[in-house]
């Protein structure tokens, strides 16, 4: 499993780096990041789309046509639309979530920011996001861009991943720790 994860990470880094260079040359890093965010939202909202990108059952031709149609329907054109088609043609759709995350990280580093992935049990308000950014900026010493994901299974609290650091204040983790402590006592 670690080898597969490493392979995906390597593929994701290479593709994200190439896309970033193209976006930088075209002076469109912000619009590419926005289009990737829209595609990521489609991906997180559709079980069928996730199956399309991860299943080896679909031929590269089927994936190419489907991704092209989805990108066109979502208004994702230009550099990102073409990029998605190339990724589909090369049968690397399975790496798209990693590519998107790697692109965000490269873009943030280019802007002198650090990126943090935040998992919350519910949607964060803009005020909560701003407060979290300010707190993380104090810890990192740099501007922080946050990517928020909602996962109701953590029950409450947050999980923040920033660089090599992870802060887990989720209720699920606290309950698991309490459960282990009670098992040790009894």
UniProtKB/Swiss-Prot annotation:
Signal sequence region: none
Keyword Cell inner membrane in record: yes
PROSITE patterns in the cross-refs: ATPASE_DELTA
Subcellular location per the Swiss-Prot or TrEMBL entry: Cell inner membrane
UniProt keyword annotations, A-Z: ATP synthesis, Cell inner membrane, Cell membrane, CF(1), Hydrogen ion transport, Ion transport, Membrane, Transport
Membrane topology: Peripheral membrane protein
Stored SUPFAM superfamilies: N-terminal domain of the delta subunit of the F1F0-ATP synthase
Pfam families the UniProt entry points to: OSCP
Cellular component GO terms held in the UniProt record: plasma membrane; proton-transporting ATP synthase complex
GO molecular function annotation: proton-transporting ATP synthase activity, rotational mechanism
Family: Belongs to the ATPase delta chain family.
Function: F(1)F(0) ATP synthase produces ATP from ADP in the presence of a proton or sodium gradient. F-type ATPases consist of two structural domains, F(1) containing the extramembraneous catalytic core and F(0) containing the membrane proton channel, linked together by a central stalk and a peripheral stalk. During catalysis, ATP synthesis in the catalytic domain of F(1) is coupled via a rotary mechanism of the central stalk subunits to proton translocation. This protein is part of the stalk that links CF(0) to CF(1). It either transmits conformational changes from CF(0) to CF(1) or is implicated in proton conduction.
Subunit structure: F-type ATPases have 2 components, F(1) - the catalytic core - and F(0) - the membrane proton channel. F(1) has five subunits: alpha(3), beta(3), gamma(1), delta(1), epsilon(1). F(0) has three main subunits: a(1), b(2) and c(10-14). The alpha and beta chains form an alternating ring which encloses part of the gamma chain. F(1) is attached to F(0) by a central stalk formed by the gamma and epsilon chains, while a peripheral stalk is formed by the delta and b chains.
Protein name in the entry: ATP synthase subunit delta
Organism: Brucella suis biovar 1 (strain 1330)
Encoding gene, per UniProt annotation: atpH
């Amino acid at each position: 499993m670690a080898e597969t994860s490493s392979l995906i990470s390597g593929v994701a880094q290479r593709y994200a780096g190439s896309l970033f260079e193209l976006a930088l040359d075209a002076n469109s890093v912000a619009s590419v990041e926005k289009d990737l965010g829209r595609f990521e939202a489609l991906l997180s909202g559709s079980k069928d789309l996730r199956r399309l990108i991860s299943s080896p059952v679909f031929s590269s031709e089927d994936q190419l046509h489907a991704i092209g149609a989805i990108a066109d329907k979502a208004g994702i054109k230009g550099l990102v639309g073409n990029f998605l088609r190339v990724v589909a043609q090369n049968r690397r759709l399975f790496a798209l979530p990693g590519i998107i995350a790697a692109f965000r990280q490269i873009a943030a580093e280019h802007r002198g920011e650090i990126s943090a992935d935040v998992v919350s049990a519910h949607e964060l308000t803009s005020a909560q996001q701003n407060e979290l950014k300010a707190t993380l900026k104090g810890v990192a010493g740099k501007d922080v861009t946050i990517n928020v994901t909602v996962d109701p299974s953590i029950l409450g609290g947050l999980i923040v991943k920033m660089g090599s650091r992870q802060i887990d204040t989720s209720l699920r983790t606290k309950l698991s720790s309490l459960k282990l402590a009670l098992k040790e006592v009894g």
